Amino acid sequence: MDRTPVTHTATDRTLGHFPSGRDVSVTVHRYEGGPGPTVFVQAAQHGIELNGPAALRRLHARLVDAEIAGTVVAVPVANPLAFDHRSYLTPEAYDAFNSNFNRIWPGDGDGSFQERLVANIWPLVEAADAAIDLHTGMPEMLEHVRFR
């Protein structure tokens, strides 16, 4: 695979709308190099997990001037509702049935508020050859990695 200089784009992806009509959106970064696989990486499904967005900021600093084969698609804050409320779960005022963003993949375009939000991120995951979901544990947790 040939590595080529990265072309970086950042776009807002609308996931849904508040009852007021305001958009709920996430920022999607694309780092496109030469031909090759696509990797999707996201962070902050839980709003108090801050290490993932920080790690993606560091990754951005390395990728923006790099030469790579393939594409990296990054969503630093997958759940802006929980993130903006500094809450592990999405506040129940938004979705009393599905407050844990991480438990409702791949979402449902006709489902609850959060299921609809997740359903609008899912195409990015589906289009990738590999997907990485970054989480942060509490200090007393044992370190672990899960993969499928």
Model-based region annotation:
Residues 1-148:
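Structured catalytic-domain cores with a bias toward divalent-metal coordination
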